[in-house]
């Protein structure tokens, strides 16, 4: 399950280190190329709203295979794109159908008992972190060697392989809700309004993930301009420092099981804020940027585990819908962060980017400070 999550989620992030060369191919400005990343995340958010809730009513393996088929076609379309608009539409469709990890995560949570749910979610999150980091690293290297289109073809091959592995090895799992699709979607609004823990978790992760997108959407612009003037391959390598996120998520899972998700949530927000304080004060010193990237990745990914542990304790029969709502808000925050990051870069460069990230984290911290543990509150 962790491996499947990693390969699938990579599709959402592979374009972040390609933006400079995409802009060059189509003669576009950096801000125009940044729309590729923004619309990918908007598509992912809509997919979480419209598709992920189906995991509560349909057999999940069949649903995942169907999504892989459409995502594969979107990758081919992106690789063949003849204009920036074509590429943007292809990436939007790719984001819309690459919601496979968010169908798998509630399944993994349901297979775990309450005492070990944080640990299980932390293990699955390792795959997500590795997919995010791998996407940036591999896409940067591939772009520097063979061009950005080659990355889409490689990802297409990975999706075909993943479909085969899921068909052969993934467990059959049927949803437990018996609602028509229309009623399923109509149930989302009341569910969101009913659960205060869900709303606060959505705001917390949406804002910290927005700050994450602010940073990683624009760091390529910073590192490929003077005084750095690095290639896209080096930009991808810088993102590799976030491997700390993969190391930290199982640790956070154990902290959640012992001290509660809300405690972990607050610590993650603090780590993210510190990362931007480092980036804004020493952004033109590469070791400081690497440390900032490390702390931000750890904080963002670990916060996701903490928030999901909280919301999955609310209702066993609605886990896909809870996760869908949660991820909608997460990736709307990510899309907002991508847009604001490029906007801030074009006006105030790196200082503006960092201030934008800190404002988003401050908004997320306001939610984290008022959050109590969900249904499996820590009682030790």
Model-derived regions: residue spans:
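C-terminal transmembrane helical hairpin of 12-TM major facilitator-type secondary transporters
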Residues: 262-307
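Structural signature of the two symmetry-related core transmembrane helices
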Residues: 62-76, 156, 263-278, 358
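Helix-loop-helix hairpin linking two adjacent transmembrane segments in secondary transporters
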Residues: 86, 123-168
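Helix-to-loop junctions at the C-terminal end of transmembrane segments
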Residues: 48-59, 248-261, 345
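Juxtamembrane intracellular "pre-TM" segments in multi-pass secondary transporters
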Residues: 170-202
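Intracellular juxtamembrane helix-capping segments at the cytosolic ends
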Residues: 100-112, 302-315
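Conserved MFS/SLC helix-loop-helix module at the cytosolic interface between two early adjacent transmembrane helices
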Residues: 46-84
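Cytoplasmic helix-loop-helix junction between adjacent transmembrane helices
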Residues: 90-127
């Amino acid at each position: 399950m962790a491996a499947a999550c990693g390969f699938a989620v990579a599709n959402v992030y592979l374009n972040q280190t390609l933006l400079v060369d995409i802009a060059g191919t189509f003669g576009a400005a950096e801000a125009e190329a940044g729309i590729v990343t923004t619309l990918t995340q908007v598509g992912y958010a809509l997919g979480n709203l419209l598709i992920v809730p189906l995991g509560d009513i349909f057999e999940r393996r069949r649903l995942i295979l169907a999504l892989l088929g459409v995502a594969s076609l979107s990758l081919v379309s992106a690789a063949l794109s003849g204009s920036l608009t074509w590429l943007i539409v292809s990436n939007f469709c790719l984001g819309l159908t690459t919601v496979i990890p968010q169908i798998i995560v509630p399944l993994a949570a349901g297979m775990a008992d309450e005492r070990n749910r944080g640990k299980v979610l932390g293990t699955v999150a390792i795959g997500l972190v590795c997919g995010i980091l791998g996407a940036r690293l591999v896409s940067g290297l591939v772009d520097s060697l063979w061009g950005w289109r080659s990355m889409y073809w490689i990802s297409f091959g990975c999706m075909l392989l993943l479909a085969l592995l899921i068909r052969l090895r993934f467990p059959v799992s049927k949803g437990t809700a018996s609602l028509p699709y229309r009623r399923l979607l109509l149930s989302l609004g009341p569910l969101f309004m009913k659960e205060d823990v869900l709303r606060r978790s959505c705001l917390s992760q949406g804002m910290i993930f927005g700050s994450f997108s602010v940073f990683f959407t624009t760091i390529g612009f910073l590192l490929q301009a003077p005084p750095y003037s690095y290639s896209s391959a080096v930009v991808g390598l810088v993102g590799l420092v976030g491997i700390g996120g993969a190391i930290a998520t199982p640790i956070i899972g154990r902290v959640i099981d012992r001290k509660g998700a809300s405690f972990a949530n607050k610590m993650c927000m603090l780590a993210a804020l510190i990362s931007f304080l480092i980036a804004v004060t020493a952004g033109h010193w590469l070791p400081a940027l690497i440390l900032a990237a490390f702390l931000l990745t750890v904080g963002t990914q670990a916060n996701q585990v903490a928030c999901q542990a909280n919301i999955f304790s609310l209702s066993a029969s609605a886990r896909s819908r809870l996760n869908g709502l949660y991820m909608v808000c997460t990736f709307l925050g990510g899309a907002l962060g991508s847009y604001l990051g490029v906007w801030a870069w074009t006006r105030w460069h790196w200082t503006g980017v960092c201030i934008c990230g800190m404002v988003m984290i401050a908004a997320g911290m306001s939610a984290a400070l008022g959050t109590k543990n969900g249904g499996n509150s820590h009682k030790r």
